[in-house]
């Protein structure tokens, strides 16, 4: 029995909407063009690590960093423009964020220094955002406003970006907390072993001291013949 024409048209329209929705969801999941660098690296003691980024004039940039493990969880940070002018400089910071607008074209340099530390190396995370993310649906060559579905996709996209940022910060906090807990656990273990050794030495000393109190002291008399 042939299907009614209205039912066929309805099924075709539903199929087109399903395909369009699937395409939009895939667009949300695809990684967009990267607008910065996000790196976690090891910084040895008495060491300095620098990174370079080409930036065009007028671009808004944000540098955010945090020390995850090592020592007092602090590091020196310095940011310079292409002419060597210092834009940002902080000493022994655990975490910080700095936003600036590039005043000229060229290669900008930012360095992390652990030269003040002699024994401990650090694990440093930084996120250097250059410019703003491009819109999900570019406005060029568009003759109509965003549809309700496209607006919903834009809202979902922004919410997912916020979720990613929150997850990153929570992972950093978890890693730093775990490092502090492991460091505290190591110190407690060493302190416990030291206390046990001290108690053992004191106990042995008390045993020998008490033994010396109750030991028989015999004196020998030597008779000298005339």
Swiss-Prot record:
Residues 211-226 are cytoplasmic. GO terms for cellular component: COPI-coated vesicle membrane; COPII-coated ER to Golgi transport vesicle; endoplasmic reticulum; endoplasmic reticulum membrane; endoplasmic reticulum-Golgi intermediate compartment; endoplasmic reticulum-Golgi intermediate compartment membrane; ER to Golgi transport vesicle membrane; Golgi apparatus. Residues 36-189 are lumenal. The chain crosses the membrane at residues 190-210. Glycans are attached at residue 105. One of its GO terms (biological process) is Golgi organization. A motif (COPI vesicle coat-binding) lies at residues 213-226. It is found in: Endoplasmic reticulum membrane; Golgi apparatus, cis-Golgi network membrane; Endoplasmic reticulum-Golgi intermediate compartment membrane; Cytoplasmic vesicle, COPI-coated vesicle membrane. A motif (COPII vesicle coat-binding) lies at residues 213-214. Keywords: Cytoplasmic vesicle, Endoplasmic reticulum, Glycoprotein, Golgi apparatus, Membrane, Protein transport, Signal, Transmembrane, Transmembrane helix, Transport. Residues 48-130 form the GOLD domain. Residues 1-35 form the signal peptide. N-linked glycosylated in complex form containing terminal sialic acid. It holds the Pfam family EMP24_GP25L. It is a single-pass type I membrane protein. Its main location: endoplasmic reticulum. Predominantly monomeric and to lesser extent homodimeric in endoplasmic reticulum, endoplasmic reticulum-Golgi intermediate compartment and trans-Golgi network. Oligomerizes with other members of the EMP24/GP25L family such as TMED2, TMED9 and TMED10. Interacts (via C-terminus) with COPG1; the interaction involves dimeric TMED7. Belongs to the EMP24/GP25L family. Potential role in vesicular protein trafficking, mainly in the early secretory pathway. Appears to play a role in the biosynthesis of secreted cargo including processing and post-translational modifications. PANTHER family: TRANSMEMBRANE EMP24 DOMAIN-CONTAINING PROTEIN (PTHR22811). This is Transmembrane emp24 domain-containing protein 7. It comes from Rattus norvegicus.
